[in-house]
């Protein structure tokens, strides 16, 4: 039988966008250990942060940077190419410390910096609340391109997250592989979640930053159009069937007496008999 830690870890890793603190609060309430269980959940917090491309603020900075498996160093240290900084992450609190200067050592440094500049322009145009990163991976034989955008509206009972992860082998390859993840949670008087993943294989004519980001932007635009079409079909199909239908009585309404009905009184300002 799974232990309390295993159950609680699954709750952490399945937390909806922007609701991790709520899940942690519920875990403390539901388990007999209370606050004492949280330190034992550190591995689950780390997996959640890396897979969800959690964003954190560096000490003394306002811009958020990404935490992922692609920019992990030793232990709980990560690096950000754009700010040339490495930093320690407390995965439970999503706070940072011990920031240090970091110099990117990669034979593909020029391409990475060019990709960062072009990706930044793309992100600012299409994803206002976003963070992004470009990192050397696989012993410098490939490049990872990451983008995450969060929109939280708890007052309106919804939160959402967009993530895109691409990998581009440096060399003779002209194909980018990647995935787009969209997660939305709506919870007013119910609980509706959208979790969708789109695998991608994108051909590029050359390995320039402009070509790579242009093809990525096109693929993202096409997927957004696919989602919009799917939403329209769902609204007229599955969702429509969930709406409560008014009963059909086949009785005629006596319009001359409508003022005596409750609805008629409401409409006429209570002037019915």
Swiss-Prot record:
Protein name: F-actin-capping protein subunit alpha
Gene source species: Emericella nidulans (strain FGSC A4 / ATCC 38163 / CBS 112.46 / NRRL 194 / M139) (Aspergillus nidulans)
GO cellular component: actin cortical patch; cortical cytoskeleton; F-actin capping protein complex
GO biological process, one term: actin cytoskeleton organization
Residue stretches spanning the membrane: none
MF terms (GO), sorted A to Z: actin filament binding
Family the entry assigns: Belongs to the F-actin-capping protein alpha subunit family.
Localisation per UniProt entry: Cytoplasm, Cytoskeleton
Protein purpose: F-actin-capping proteins bind in a Ca(2+)-independent manner to the fast growing ends of actin filaments (barbed end) thereby blocking the exchange of subunits at these ends. Unlike other capping proteins (such as gelsolin and severin), these proteins do not sever actin filaments.
Subunit note: Heterodimer of an alpha and a beta subunit.
Lineage: Eukaryota, Fungi, Dikarya, Ascomycota, Pezizomycotina
PROSITE patterns: F_ACTIN_CAPPING_A_1 (PS00748), F_ACTIN_CAPPING_A_2 (PS00749)
Chief location of this protein within or outside the cell: cytoplasm
PANTHER family with a match to the protein in the record: F-ACTIN-CAPPING PROTEIN SUBUNIT ALPHA (PTHR10653:SF0)
Keywords annotated in UniProt: Actin capping, Actin-binding, Cytoplasm, Cytoskeleton
GN (gene name): cap1
Alphabetical list of Pfam families matching this protein: F-actin_cap_A (PF01267)
